[in-house]
A protein has these predicted regions:
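C-terminal edge-of-domain segments
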Residues: 208-212
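A glycine- and small-residue-enriched flexible loop/hinge signal that marks low-structured segments
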Residues: 1-165, 204-206
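Extended, compositionally biased non-globular segments
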Residues: 151-207
């Protein structure tokens, strides 16, 4: 999670998101009141460095389960009473079209309010990956990472063990494939039970070269 200096939200680049950037999320929000706002306006901050809401985002992530979106209104209020952007501009003073562009095209993270709902919340849980990527949101990345770690934990003891080959096809024997898939599925079964997955299926390619 990265928090850059925002010199002007109206001139903030909105063409930085793209493929293969799922490990990056960019926070351009900060508080428009309280200590954060005072620090931003202080004469000691002559360079007008943003006093980012990065800490708030990290706090929400630490509280959220891997599959939960930090923009979930019911669960994750930010505690920021007056949302602003990193140049000190209040979110409420910014044109809605620009906010939409920063959100959907720029894929930035910042704080927003909702009509009829007290408090402020995250606009979304974007990564800087493509919006149509399987890894377009932080929770998608975190969930997949947990699945991979879990599978590795269960499968690692099988390394160096016997694998059997079908004498006719030269491919992995069906019972070897079934065994490895059953072992790997244990991690995903636990995640599904905990509500972190909607479903799962491990597939082991029987045609892979295991003897070379």
């Amino acid at each position: 999670v990265y928090a850059p200096k925002v010199s002007s939200v109206k001139q903030q680049a909105v063409n930085l998101a793209g493929a293969n950037q799922s490990r990056v999320s960019v926070v351009i929000g900060q508080t428009g009141s309280g200590t954060g706002a005072e620090l931003y306006k202080d004469k000691g901050n002559a360079a007008k460095a943003s006093v980012s809401g990065l800490g708030v985002v990290l706090g929400l992530l630490s509280r959220a389960k891997v599959h939960q979106c930090i923009a979930w209104i019911k669960e994750f209020p930010t505690g920021v009473s007056l949302p602003a952007f990193g140049d000190g501009t209040l979110v409420r003073d910014v044109d809605k079209a620009l906010i939409e562009t920063l959100d959907t095209t720029g894929r930035y993270l910042f704080f927003v309010t909702h009509t009829g709902q007290a408090g402020s919340y995250m606009n979304d849980s974007h990564t800087m990956d493509s919006g149509i990527s399987d890894y377009a949101t932080i929770e998608s990345v975190r969930t997949m990472d947990k699945a991979v770690r879990g599978i590795r934990t269960y499968v690692k003891p099988e390394l160096g063990g016997n694998v059997y080959v079908d004498p006719t096809t030269g491919q992995l024997a069906s019972y070897t494939v079934a065994h490895l898939e059953t072992v790997a599925n244990q991690a995903l079964e636990a995640m599904e039970r905990d509500g972190e997955l909607s479903g799962y299926k491990v597939e082991v390619d029987p045609a892979q070269h295991v003897a070379s």
